[in-house]
Amino acid sequence: VPKIESIRPGGTLEASFSAYPLAELLLGILRGNLTGRLDLFLHPEPRNVVFFKDGVPVSVQLPDAGVSLAKILIDSGRVPHEQGLDLLRMAEASGRSEEQVIQQHNVLSPGVLDEARRRRARAQLVRLFDASPLDFRFQEGVALPAGVPLTILQPLPLVYEGLVKTQDRTVVNRFLEAHARSTFDLAPTFPRGVDPFEWGPQVERVVTQLPPPLSVARLAQAGLPQEVALAAITSLHLASMLELREQGPGVRPLAAVAPPARPPPP
């Protein structure tokens, strides 16, 4: 599959996440500073789409990704548990979206609803890290239609969270097979003084303050869980924020701890 960065103006790339994992696709779109439309074939109708502008997701519309807005509001404490379940039941009974029901009953301020949309959009994209057989199509140059709700997300935190949570080991296995025992230095492209991947204070402190060189083993020895250490190093490597210090041998691939989630049948 050709790299998304090499797409021609107005061009189209069609593939599946098994051939072109979502982590690599998101970073390729970011690296290429691309604007366009990403269709995800979760449903026979063309209704699951992500719009990008200058490499960044700016509108996420994935009704078939299986993430409930009402449950996000419950989990974040924005609505009481029973009220949230009532909203969910009303949406299911009426055939409307949860968002339409919430807006009709005017239970949230616009700011709270916007934040819930962003949380849902992030959760939807992270969930797709396990949808390895899923087909997609990216069309370069397609602009965001007027009136479409904005859900602007940063790609680097999406990649890190997706690598931590996914059961599909494709991306981390590629790294392990090549660099499991390699050592690295942070590249000058890594922005010091910020947390570009939204690792959180503990991970950010270990990665940036641990005396070089960096490796999966050294991050784990410094107290990070193995899956967090692996996701942090892999995301840095994918984002071209590591410089190889010493090439070490790879290891055998990890097996998935659970079968990857598959999209619903048409």
Feature-to-residue mapping (PLM):
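Acidic, Ser/Thr/Pro-enriched low-complexity segments and adjacent helix/loop capping patches
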Residues: 1-266
